[in-house]
């Protein structure tokens, strides 16, 4: 059997893909999903909106929950309330989904599904509860399913000062965009 010529070996090496792993698998993609949390409230005759927080998904997608960290809600005084959030999308009872949704955001009745702030000084409850607080300076709002398409089209919720209040004090909007 004849040995291949050096020219033939050189040609073969240039045509074969490299065996060394590509760095493209190790680099972060140039774009990622970013979540925004906005609060809108009325103060006197003025309607105000502010971005409370943003959070990015992991570089290679939104496969795991994301958590907003922010210092306060603008429409609620810390220490004088127990902030509670209601979303229409996670209501299971028709009375909570279908009646006064624009006004109450899914919580016209006490039996509706509410996300009441849970005190979490050890930061261990964020996987169990949607809304937690360290009791001093920070609130944590967790999105358990960031891959769901509803977050692209903006999810609106209502913020209540207390879980027993009849009407919300502000509107929350959560959405994600590709940045």
Curated annotation (Swiss-Prot):
Role: Retroviral envelope proteins mediate receptor recognition and membrane fusion during early infection. Endogenous envelope proteins may have kept, lost or modified their original function during evolution.
Region Truncated surface protein, residue ranges: 23-179
Location relative to the cell: Virion
Family label: Belongs to the gamma type-C retroviral envelope protein family. HERV class-I F(c)1 env subfamily.
Signal peptide (residue range): 1-22
Record keyword Glycoprotein present: yes
Superkingdom of origin organism: Eukaryota
Glycosylated residues in this chain: 69
Name this polypeptide is given: Putative endogenous retrovirus group FC1 Env polyprotein
Extra information: Ortholog of the human HERV-F(c)1_Xq21.33 envelope protein.
Keywords: ERV, Glycoprotein, Signal, Transposable element, Viral envelope protein, Virion
Gene symbol of the encoding locus: ERVFC1
Organism the protein comes from: Gorilla gorilla gorilla
């Amino acid at each position: 059997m004849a040995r291949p010529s050096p020219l033939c070996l050189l040609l073969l090496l240039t045509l074969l893909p490299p065996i060394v792993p590509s760095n493209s698998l190790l680099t972060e993609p140039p774009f990622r999903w970013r979540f925004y949390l906005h609060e809108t409230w009325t103060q006197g005759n003025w309607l105000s909106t502010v971005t409370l927080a943003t959070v990015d998904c992991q570089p290679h997608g939104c496969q795991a929950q994301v958590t907003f960290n922010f210092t306060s809600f603008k429409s609620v005084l810390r220490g004088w309330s127990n902030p509670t959030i209601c979303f229409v999308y996670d209501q299971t009872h028709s009375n909570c989904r279908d009646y006064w949704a624009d006004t109450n955001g899914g919580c016209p009745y006490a039996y509706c599904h509410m996300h009441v702030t849970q005190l979490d000084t050890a930061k261990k409850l964020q996987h169990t509860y949607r809304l937690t607080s360290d009791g001093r300076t920070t609130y944590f709002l967790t999105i358990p399913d960031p891959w769901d398409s509803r977050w692209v089209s903006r999810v609106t919720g209502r913020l209540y000062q207390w879980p027993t209040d009849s009407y919300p004090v502000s509107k929350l909007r959560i959405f994600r965009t590709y940045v």
